[in-house]
Amino acid sequence: MSLMVVSMVCVGFFLLQGAWPHEGVHRKPSLLAHPGPLVKSEETVILQCWSDVRFQHFLLHREGKFKDTLHLIGEHHDGVSKANFSIGPMMQDLAGTYRCYGSVTHSPYQLSAPSDPLDIVITGLYEKPSLSAQPGPTVLAGESVTLSCSSRSSYDMYHLSREGEAHERRFSAGPKVNGTFQADFPLGPATHGGTYRCFGSFRDSPYEWSNSSDPLLVSVTGNPSNSWPSPTEPSSETGNPRHLHVLIGTSVVIILFILLLFFLLHRWCCNKKNAVVMDQEPAGNRTVNREDSDEQDPQEVTYAQLNHCVFTQRKITRPSQRPKTPPTDIIVYTELPNAEP
């Protein structure tokens, strides 16, 4: 039984480790940028670190430069703790990859797991590129469309962003053609429109981008039979992964507890049933049946021997119980005369 209990506890532990993944003392917080991760030169961005864990302190630092770590006291509202870090006015030295951590009051030197990385990019440093659409900015639903970003500047990389999306696409610039460098972004069959912009950057300064191109509105006409959901629209079939992990972990714990309880109850019932059966065995199988020892008549004594619920009987017959049949030998007595002295 002890082996079964240990096995179930181990299974529950590893499943819970899968439902709630973490590296630090507490779960990782989330890091967001307001109004967005692309920040124009000299403007300010707010980096918000938040969590449903009641952290008292939040720390923010930029990768590669730990001396830039910032510390704020957390605010608590509606079960959420958060801290807003103001970064700006934006310069090249402030661009980079940021992470944040949480900490509670009684353990200020024990940090949570780090948040997911957030790239903060400074824009507006170089000449803006041009953005165009092929076959055009207005396409039929399901029709393929390609956006081309080009410039006379020798950018190594071009970046395409869609309004409302946090992540951008990037492609290396192609060879110079007719005095311009260009990168093509195939979007595939069009299902949803949107406003797009592109930027250029150099390989040795990936967080420093050019001015954005003029915005390009891509319109999709018609109703496709099977349209994909827009990346900016929440899907009703997709829930919060963290809440889903919590729900799965709780269900696993409850199931393991019920199985353990059923196993212990089954063992207890079996032991109790065996004890009752032993107490109710016939008394005749465990006692010696005999008459009063003072009587002279021969008698038969029957013993019952109990050995792990298997009964064997021995029948013992006293010598007087042997059959009273006359012996076959004939004995003849002869009277002899007394000898005189």
Curated annotation (Swiss-Prot):
Residues 266-341 are cytoplasmic. Glycans are attached at residues 84, 178, 211. It is found in: Cell membrane. Gene3D superfamilies: Immunoglobulins. It comes from the Eukaryota. The keyword Phosphoprotein does not apply. Disulfide bonds join 49-100, 149-198. Residues 1-21 form the signal peptide. Keywords: Cell membrane, Disulfide bond, Glycoprotein, Immunoglobulin domain, Membrane, Receptor, Repeat, Signal, Transmembrane, Transmembrane helix. Residues 22-245 are extracellular. Residues 223-239 have a biased composition (Low complexity). CDD domains: IgC2_D2_LILR_KIR_like. GO terms for biological process: immune response; immune response-regulating signaling pathway. SMART domains: IG. It is a single-pass type I membrane protein. GO terms for cellular component: membrane; plasma membrane. Its main location: membrane. Receptor on natural killer (NK) cells for HLA-C alleles (HLA-Cw1, HLA-Cw3 and HLA-Cw7). Inhibits the activity of NK cells thus preventing cell lysis. This is Killer cell immunoglobulin-like receptor 2DL3. The gene is KIR2DL3.
